[in-house]
Amino acid sequence: MDVLMEAGSSAGHAARRRTLFGLFRAVATATAVSVALGACGGGGGGGGGGGGGSPEPPPPAPTPAPAPSPAPTGPIAAQMTVPTPVGYDADRLAAFNRLNEIRLSAGLGMLAQSTAMDQAAQAHADWMIANDSFTHAETAGTVGFTGESWPRRDAVFGYTPIGGEEVMAASGHAGAEVDALVNGVYHRAGILAFEPVDVGIGWSASSAVDVSMPLVIDITRPGTDTTRGLGQAPQASTHGAAIWPIDGARNVPLRLGAEIPNPVPSQNVLSLGTPASVAVEEEATISATAFVLTKSETGEVVPAQIVSSSNDPNLLMPRSFIALVPRAPLSPNTTYSVVFVGGTVEAVTGVTGVVNRSWSFSTAAQ
């Protein structure tokens, strides 16, 4: 199975991110699963795939988001249930269910279906097949063009996003693609963000092009809804911080996969192990005093690199997310222990907090 993936930018932090677009080919791993991960910044558009056929006129520019409301005083209640989605085929339903299973297991609120964002995500999945181009950025005049960037496409279909991410995968069935996405660094940061309340999912399939099964997931909150989006704090976390892999997780993959750009560019991305991570709400900057991964049975410390917003070479990491990336693939059938000692600083108030976590997980057989 080949899985090709690309992570999108945050609409709220695009100014500090680089734009990286293109078609990233899968590279085989020892598990016979090819995983290519790419992260692209700069939500305002950029290059994209070409395409044949008659050009279609671009849609009108989206209506600007309304002015921000006063700062919220506290988090909204986490969405522990959401309505059953309508209109999904088996693959999109599998992606929706798996995405929410991941968030719930990490102590985060679920994401509700947005039919407007579904249309935007589906249009972009169809655009990638029509133009055989795997990128977040559409080009005006190409077949199926609906907007240069994902926030513009969402707005065209009637949804004004505030913050959030678009993550994408290709060449696989949607449920498995979500599992591959959460095994990366940048993709995981988007999936485990506290702030989003809505999701739109698009998925298409064609055997005639290289981008054969594009999955598009837009994750955000509404800029026109003062109860669930604009002016509201993030969904509350039942755990205070979201760790991954979760405590007691089994069959954790051994490798990070071919994430592009490489979060640890000093070595080949395929030589990196599955990261451990901690996420907090978006207005907090998280830092580590100690972040250590050991083999539980022997106590052997695993050589690893901490990646956070303070040292991310690709300028893609949100300040609220920190990862520990092993310098080598994890060992099969092995239990690992993680210890995180750190803290947070709120961007607006300067209030500090303590985040101490310890947990364990077990790896897959191969």
Label every model-predicted segment.
Residues 2-6, 13, 21, 48-288, ...:
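Functional surface patches built around histidine and acidic residues
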Residues 19-24, 28:
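N-terminal export leaders
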Residues 30-34:
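Alpha-helical transmembrane segments
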Residues 36-39:
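C-terminal motif of bacterial Sec signal peptides marking the signal peptidase cleavage site
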Residues 41-45:
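Bacterial signal peptide processing site
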Residues 263-366:
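Acidic, low-complexity Ser/Thr/Gly/Pro-rich repeat segments typical of extracellular/periplasmic
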